[in-house]
């Protein structure tokens, strides 16, 4: 019985079963190599809690799960990449010297007017007007430089005369037009003074001829003489104006002279304005003489 029990307890293929081998000791389990644990799919295990996750399955069907070389330490690689990215962002922030904004600064920025509000519109309008004025000043300076640059005009003898500008530009210069206006005014005033002097000459002072109370039809009872004291001398006692038509003609001439002065002034102003318009148009369309 013992031999049979021992034989019953022997492992097949071992001695004692007719095949040779080491008989098993009673009371001890036969020594077998432990089974290796099956590999688990970590991706499936991590995503098992998500809705719609697929059922867990082995990496290799009908075979024990094995980790391929490309699947090793994926989580560690992700963590390393994340650390590198964080370090790069920190270096970029330190290089830009980013300073955290204080709450009061944010409040001040929020209180600024938005685009489209009247304050911003006024500021934009002021800047636009300032830009227009600066552009106009630049145009005037360029026009002045173009008018004052030296020109050379050939003469009949072959010599050249250095001119500050072309004759047309000189005529259209504001200084020339202003001088022309003053010249017209001065000439008009001088013309008026000449008329006043002629009025004094035309004034006739009555003086009886010596030894004659009367005069015949062929003799003149009065001789014209220029008054020594001006027009006031004609109003002295003993003098009278025998011919009122001359005085009327003198007054008419004086009125015409005043009108002539006014007309001259108006023409001078109109010439000046026309010159400015022509000068502006010539600048916009291009130089008059190249």
Swiss-Prot record:
It is found in: Membrane. GO terms for cellular component: membrane. Keywords: Membrane, Transmembrane, Transmembrane helix. Residues 1-98, 209-236 are annotated as: Disordered. Residues 63-76 have a biased composition (Basic and acidic residues). Residues 87-97 have a biased composition (Low complexity). It is a single-pass membrane protein. The chain crosses the membrane at residues 261-281. Its main location: membrane. It comes from the Eukaryota. This is Uncharacterized protein ARIH2OS.
């Amino acid at each position: 019985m013992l031999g049979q029990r021992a034989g019953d307890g022997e492992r097949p293929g071992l001695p004692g079963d007719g095949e040779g081998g080491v008989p098993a000791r009673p009371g001890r389990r036969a020594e077998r190599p432990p089974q290796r644990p099956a590999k688990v799919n970590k991706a499936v295990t991590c995503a098992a809690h998500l809705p719609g996750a697929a059922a867990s399955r082995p990496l290799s069907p009908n075979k024990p799960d094995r980790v391929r070389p490309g699947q090793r330490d994926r989580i560690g690689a992700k963590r390393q990449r994340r650390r590198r990215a964080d370090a790069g962002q920190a270096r970029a922030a330190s290089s830009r010297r980013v300073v955290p904004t204080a709450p009061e600064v944010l409040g001040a920025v929020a209180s600024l007017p938005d685009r489209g509000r009247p304050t911003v519109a006024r500021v934009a309008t002021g800047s636009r007007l300032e830009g227009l004025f600066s552009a106009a000043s630049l145009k005037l300076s360029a026009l002045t430089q173009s008018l004052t640059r030296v020109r050379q005009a050939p003469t009949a003898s072959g010599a050249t005369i250095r001119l500050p500008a072309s004759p047309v530009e000189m005529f259209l210069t504001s200084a020339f037009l202003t001088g022309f206006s003053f010249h017209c005014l001065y000439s008009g005033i001088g013309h008026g003074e000449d008329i006043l002097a002629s009025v004094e000459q035309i004034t006739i002072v009555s003086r009886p001829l010596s030894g004659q109370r009367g005069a015949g039809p062929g003799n003149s009872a009065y001789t014209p003489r220029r008054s020594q004291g001006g027009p006031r001398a004609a109003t002295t006692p003993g003098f009278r104006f025998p011919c009122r038509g001359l005085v009327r003609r003198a007054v008419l001439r004086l009125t015409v002279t005043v009108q002539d002065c006014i007309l001259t002034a108006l023409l001078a102003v109109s010439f000046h304005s026309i010159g400015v318009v022509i000068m502006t148009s010539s600048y916009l369309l291009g130089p008059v003489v190249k």
